[in-house]
């Protein structure tokens, strides 16, 4: 009888250790993918004109590395935004839900969808203005590039898993 009890106890201990190991590995993978999402997004195949690294930075700003950089400030209370001050000029990129808001150095304002297509463009008096899509994307890139450049390389690189997990999401960005 004691042999059966010890076998059953051994099975339960083995299952418990296995469960804890799987949960620990899952937690590590989740944290790794979130914390390094900007780095991974820089290296994921994507259609030209889409900026998955900028999207990952804005979506995961609470997880991603946001170093102290002169002229850059972060706001993550309610929405995620990055402000860049360059001399007397200021630009702000903000993500709320699925909408990006960009306030350019020239005081123009743009509402963009997640694949960086401008939906609306306004001047400082909120009159509709004409815009150049590439110029707006370039200005957005200039606003956040110092933060993207500061992202560390992961200690354990799970690029393949990031690509697998987000490849469909990136395809969806490209098609919208």
Q: Which residues are covered by each model-predicted region?
A:
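Extracytoplasmic electrostatic interaction patches
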Residues: 68-176
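N-terminal first transmembrane alpha-helix
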Residues: 4, 10, 34-36, 40, ...
